[in-house]
C-alpha cells in the first residue's frame, strides 16, 4: 500500500474486470479521450477470475496510448478482491471506482478533480442506458433520493 504522503497529484481509477471483452473497449476509448492532463490520472485494471481476451485488449491500448498510465494486474475472483488489490497499488491523491461495462464523459476526471478536496467525497452522476435500444432507464440512485439525503446533485453546470 502506498503511504498517503507519497501519493502523486491526481486520480486513481480502479476498474475491476471480469470477462469484459465485449465492452471494455468503450471504457478504454472514454479514458483516452479525457480532457484532463493524462499525467493526472492512472487507470488500474484488475482482472478477477476467468480469463478471456480482456487483458489483450487492455495491453493493446497500453501500447497505442503510452501517454495514459494504464496498469494491468490480477486478483483472486470477486469484485471486492479486485477493488482491494487496486487500492493497494493506487498512488494518486484521490481514488474512484469504475465498472468495466461503464464509460465516462470526456470531462469526468477533470470535473471530479476540480471539486475534490481532502476529506470531501465527490459523487459523479450516471445513467443506465439500454445498449440495445439506447433508452435511458431510471438510475438506482435517483435525484429525489439524493436530494432527500441532503446531497447536492448538480454543483456545477455542464
Each PLM stretch: what is its role?
Residues 95:
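Short aromatic/hydrophobic "clamp" motif used to bind/position activated sugar donors
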Residues 125, 139-158:
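Short, flexible, basic/aromatic active-site loop/helix in glycosyltransferases
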Residues 39-50, 71-75:
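Short beta-strand/loop segment that forms part of the nucleotide-sugar
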Residues 20-34:
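Short, well-formed alpha-helical segments that are part of the catalytic scaffolds
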Residues 47-56, 99:
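A conserved acidic beta->alpha catalytic loop
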Residues 74-90:
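Glycine-rich, basic loop-to-helix element that forms the pyrophosphate-binding segment
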Residues 9-12, 42:
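Cell-envelope/extracellular polymer assembly enzymes that use nucleotide-activated donors
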